[in-house]
Amino acid sequence: MKVAVLGAAGGIGQALALLLKTQLPSGSELSLYDIAPVTPGVAVDLSHIPTDVKIKGFSGEDATPALEGADVVLISAGVARKPGMDRSDLFNVNAGIVKNLVQQIAKTCPQACIGIITNPVNTTVAIAAEVLKKAGVYDKNKLFGVTTLDIIRSNTFVAELKGKSATEVEVPVIGGHSGVTILPLLSQIPGVSFSDQEIADLTKRIQNAGTEVVEAKAGGGSATLSMGQAAARFGLSLVRAMQGEKGVVECAYVEGDGHYARFFSQPLLLGKNGVEERQSIGKLSAFEQQALEGMLDTLKKDIALGEDFVNK
């Protein structure tokens, strides 16, 4: 199993690469790519960690050597948020980066499962889909927007509030991956109940958690370490499922039946070829139903922005 990380010299990429080097199954290969000249050195640095995961780093304009034979590609390349920016301010720079990298994937490893981490995910996933479609290699079961950070944040905040162990809380999060499009299904956590005020406050905190980190880092970056952990969790789940493990479920942002929007984050049963089954979002509370209906316009606009970027 070969996993490629594109954008591997950045804050998310380095954290992700470290976690994959220590946690991928023995015999896996890890390839790191970034435009930055330091990238081969990041791979050398990580190669000294004693695990049975082969690692190689590549830099420059051409990602092809890193992509050859890749089964999974995780894209974290792009610029990070600064205070005062929202994820959509990143669009102007990151849209072009994602388009370029996905064009290279379409040529070099069109069969690979692709996880998009680069924000704004609501839009960059639509860009990737259109690029793959133009190249004639699009498989909607193999393209994911990685929303796992919303899930791990939800798990952490709920556990803190309710005095539970964070490892035993699992909150499904649906919708998209920015602001109001992030919808944690707090009504679906077994054995935990909330007041209306707690639900309103928690939902808002989860939606704004990225901004919390950007502000706390005071201009020095955005959520890189927790995002690295979230991306590793998703990537490792995908690898386990592709290697035949049964019952692996993760929420991610994928193209579905279009019932709510063309792309939508929901629980997915993962399998050998990516998405095996798009699972139901279950029964929503009145609050969740209202939040879902209220976000769809925003989500659809985000998606259209990505489609238009490729097709204009």
From Swiss-Prot:
Catalyzes the reversible oxidation of malate to oxaloacetate. Belongs to the LDH/MDH superfamily. MDH type 1 family. Pfam families: Ldh_1_C (PF02866), Ldh_1_N (PF00056). CDD domains: MDH_glyoxysomal_mitochondrial. SUPFAM superfamilies: LDH C-terminal domain-like, NAD(P)-binding Rossmann-fold domains. Homodimer. This is Malate dehydrogenase. One of its GO terms (cellular component) is cytoplasm. GO terms for molecular function: L-malate dehydrogenase (NAD+) activity. HAMAP family: Malate_dehydrog_1. It is an enzyme of class 1 (oxidoreductase). It catalyses: (S)-malate + NAD(+) = oxaloacetate + NADH + H(+). PROSITE patterns: MDH (PS00068). The active site is at 177 (proton acceptor). It comes from Klebsiella pneumoniae subsp. pneumoniae (strain ATCC 700721 / MGH 78578). Its EC number is 1.1.1.37. Keywords: NAD, Oxidoreductase, Tricarboxylic acid cycle. GO terms for biological process: malate metabolic process; tricarboxylic acid cycle. The keyword Oxidoreductase applies. Substrate binds at residues 81, 87, 119, 153. NAD(+) binds at residues 7-13, 34, 94, 117-119, 227.
